[in-house]
Regions:
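An alpha-helix initiation/capping motif
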Residues: 199-207
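Substrate-binding/active-site clefts of carbohydrate-active enzymes
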Residues: 20-67, 73-188, 208-217, 221
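Short, glycine/acidic-enriched loop or turn micro-motifs at the edges of active sites
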Residues: 128, 199, 228
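Short catalytic-loop micro-motif centered on adjacent basic/acidic residues
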Residues: 123, 192-198
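Surface-exposed, flexible loop/turn segments at secondary-structure boundaries
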Residues: 77-79, 203, 228-230
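Noncatalytic carbohydrate-binding groove/subsite architecture in carbohydrate-active enzymes
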Residues: 211, 226-233
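C-terminal motif of bacterial Sec signal peptides marking the signal peptidase cleavage site
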Residues: 14-16
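Sec-dependent signal peptide recognition
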Residues: 2-8
């Protein structure tokens, strides 16, 4: 209940602090370069922590002037080396599945459909740099899809991210699997991606993957985490 009250209070403050767009403005063509993006943590947004519960707040977000709902990673979280009891959203075990804590794919689809009915776009937080250390790809025997420590033969750890395994972008099969996973979500109606640590992934991968994504959705919304100039290409 406290989270619900906090959400309502923040929404009320934001609505009160800014003028509401009139009908003509709301019906004007979408401008991706001047859009309002709202980051949504499914687990924390509601007491239930589910897609279905978060869906109930979509009209509130619309009334706040939000254009795009950016979902923090929605995928299953790895168990091996998990940080804390809940784990990090950015330690993904399966790119083509949803975290069962949030619901199933049908619930996710319903969330996206409702957002679209309200004129909202939905983008996913996409973690292309690494997976969890017990990810589906690793369990399936694709060791060559990872950057391995020469002495131990296990995936390297970057920074203090001890729960992740760095992906090997010199491997064409891994690149194809990553692109295929992105297409999976675009075909389900997702409107784009916020690309986590985009600067750690080769620019030619982004260019190749997005060329294929745009074959399905030419107006895909892309947001990169990083200040490197090559990310603007």
């Amino acid at each position: 209940m406290k989270k619900t009250a906090l959400f309502a209070a923040v929404a009320a403050m934001l609505v009160g602090c800014g003028s509401q767009p009139d009908k003509a403005e709301q019906e004007s063509a979408f401008d991706k370069y001047n859009s309002v993006v709202y980051e949504l943590n499914v687990r924390q947004a509601t007491p239930e922590g589910t897609f279905a519960a978060a869906e109930e707040y979509l009209p509130v977000l619309k009334s706040m002037g939000v254009d795009i709902v950016w979902l923090m990673p929605i995928h299953p979280i790895g168990a091996y080396g998990r940080k804390g009891t809940l784990g990090s959203y950015y330690s993904i075990s399966d790119y083509e599945a949803v975290n069962p804590e949030f619901g199933d794919l049908a619930a996710f689809d319903h969330f996206v459909d409702r957002a679209h009915e309200l004129g909202l776009k939905v983008i996913l937080d996409w973690v292309a740099n690494h997976t969890s250390r017990d990810a589906k790809w690793w369990s399936e025997g694709h060791a060559d899809w990872y950057v391995l420590d020469e002495q131990t033969g296990v995936p390297i750890v970057q920074y203090d991210w001890t729960d992740i395994a760095k992906l090997n972008y010199d491997n064409a099969d891994m690149r194809e699997a990553m692109t295929s996973a992105m297409l999976f979500w675009i075909e389900r109606g997702v409107d784009g991606f916020r690309c986590d640590v985009a600067f750690e992934v080769p620019i030619d991968f982004w260019q190749q993957a997005f060329a294929r994504v745009k074959e399905i959705n030419p107006d895909v919304y892309l947001l990169a985490e990083g200040e490197k100039t090559f990310l603007h290409d």
